[in-house]
Amino acid sequence: MDMETAYKLARQAIETTYRGIANVYQYGSAVDEHGIQREGETLAMQDVPCKVSFESHDTTSQTETANSLTQKIRLFVAPDCVIDAGSKVEVVQDSTTTNYKSTGQAATYPTHREYELELFNGWA
């Protein structure tokens, strides 16, 4: 089996795990239907198949008296889905809608992209 076929099969396998749909929003100026330039949120991508994954880390050390738990949130999407850092990502997964913010560049693979997310707390 050649690499291209292997990547195609691996991508199909990964995409079978996608349980969510994402809408991606960006903040900036845009011209509305009346030709007026306005600042605000615009829809950049709609109904993107995805999966949100959560990973927790216990950061307790011997000198600390209390446990501290950190959580990494990752978004898995197709390799052709490019999301700018700072974009708002609205995800519907497992009947729950949550708004996140893309925090940086994606880890890009031939089969998918992984974006680190954090909870969205409004536009900066």
Label every model-predicted segment.
Residues 1-6, 21, 26-124:
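Short, conserved turn/kink motifs that form compact alpha/beta structural patches or helix kinks used as
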Residues 13-17:
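N-terminal helix-cap/turn-to-beta initiation motif at the start of protein domains
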